[in-house]
């Protein structure tokens, strides 16, 4: 009985947790003392596709396939992030020119489409990753341009033999699009635990980046120092990731703009006094921020708490007109800024 026959029989009725262990048995040669390496690799891919199609991933794997609209316009419409927009535009221009040279039969420079995004939480890394995927589709780099968002929990298993198939199944979903790994540095804990499953996930990702070099773009993201440690931890990562984009924290004025963006989307307005108070409070938050400052997430949280404060204020009033229902006052904003979460 050959490896494939044993594998197919073993998969019938197997749960997701059993697949990784079964694959491990094959690899170490229990069923085939001298397995053909090419055959084993082929089976790994088939197993990953079975996991992807027949099982549910954890909540830490998010599919973003909204591909409508102009990605360049969406990039321009983002609040702040001037240097980020410039970097993405520069990358797009370079790729476009290389495609033109290729079409004319000229030599082309080698382009690495994989990216490192570093910056604090809430600075737009995930949003820009989605836009980059769509730009790559527009340029003909990717067929679909969708984004699969994940993190350590979405890639690593809890037991021996789970991580490889689990990581593979996420990669299969990302083919022809972008695999976005948030807090990628968590795959390499400080101190470099030798038996950590994160190392297995990295090895699998690097292998698939080579196998699917024309179908997969990987973007890794996280804090600057931690991401540098992550890249430096593995020569394979160093050779594949050589373009870095820095996402700066938002200014107080930019956070005010983000707050007002949520207001506009939800049909709210500010009183004149509240307008001044809003800017002062965001300036204060930026001046007193720590490493975990939430940036745009913080602005969204303040907005959500402010409209809750307004609802509490107006709950017992009668005959509410549109002005009262839409206007946020200083007292409402005080309720919004009351919590120091993510400051």
PLM feature spans:
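Conserved C-terminal "switch" segment of AAA+ ATPases
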Residues: 139-144, 226-232, 238-239, 247-292, ...
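Walker B catalytic acidic pair
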Residues: 182-184
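Pre-Walker A (pre-P-loop) alpha-helix and adjacent loop at the N terminus of AAA/AAA+ ATPase modules
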Residues: 71-113
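Canonical AAA+ ATPase core
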Residues: 186-192, 200-248, 265-266
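N-terminal Sec-dependent export signals
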Residues: 1-66
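Walker A/P-loop
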Residues: 108-145, 172
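Short glycine-rich substrate-engagement loop in P-loop NTPases that contacts/grips substrate
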Residues: 144-174
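C-terminal engagement/docking regions of AAA+ P-loop ATPases
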Residues: 309-343
């Amino acid at each position: 009985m050959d490896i494939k026959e044993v594998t197919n029989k073993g998969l019938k009725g197997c749960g997701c947790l059993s697949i990784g262990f079964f694959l491990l048995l094959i690899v170490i040669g229990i069923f085939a003392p001298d397995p053909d390496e090419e055959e084993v690799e082929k089976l790994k891919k088939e197993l990953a596709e079975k996991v992807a199609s027949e099982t549910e991933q954890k909540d830490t794997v998010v599919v973003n396939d909204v591909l409508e609209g102009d990605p360049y316009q969406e990039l321009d419409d983002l609040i702040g992030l001037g240097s980020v927009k410039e970097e993405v535009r520069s990358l797009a221009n370079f790729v476009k020119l290389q495609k033109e040279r290729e079409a004319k039969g000229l030599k082309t420079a080698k382009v690495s489409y994989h990216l490192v995004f570093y910056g604090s939480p809430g600075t737009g890394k995930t949003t820009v990753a989605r836009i980059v995927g769509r730009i790559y589709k527009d340029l003909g780099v990717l067929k679909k341009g969708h984004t699969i968002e994940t993190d350590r929990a979405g890639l690593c298993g809890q037991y021996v033999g789970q991580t490889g198939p689990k990581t593979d199944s996420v990669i299969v979903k990302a083919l022809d699009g972008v695999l976005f790994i948030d807090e990628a540095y968590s795959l390499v804990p400080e101190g470099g635990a030798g038996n950590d499953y994160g190392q297995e996930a990295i090895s699998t990702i690097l292998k698939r980046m080579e196998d699917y070099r024309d179908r997969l773009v990987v973007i890794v993201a996280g804090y600057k120092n931690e991401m540098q440690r992550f890249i430096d931890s593995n020569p394979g990562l160093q050779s594949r990731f050589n373009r870095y984009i820095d996402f700066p924290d938002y200014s107080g004025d930019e956070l005010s703009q983000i707050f007002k963006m949520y207001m506009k989307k939800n049909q709210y307005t500010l009183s004149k006094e509240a307008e001044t108070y809003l800017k002062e409070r965001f300036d204060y938050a930026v001046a007193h921020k720590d490493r975990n400052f939430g940036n745009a997430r913080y602005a969204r949280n303040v907005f959500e708490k402010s409209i809750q404060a307004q609802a509490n204020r107006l709950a017992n009033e009668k005959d509410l007109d549109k002005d009262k229902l839409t206007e946020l006052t200083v007292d409402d904003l005080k309720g919004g800024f009351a919590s120091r979460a993510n400051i």
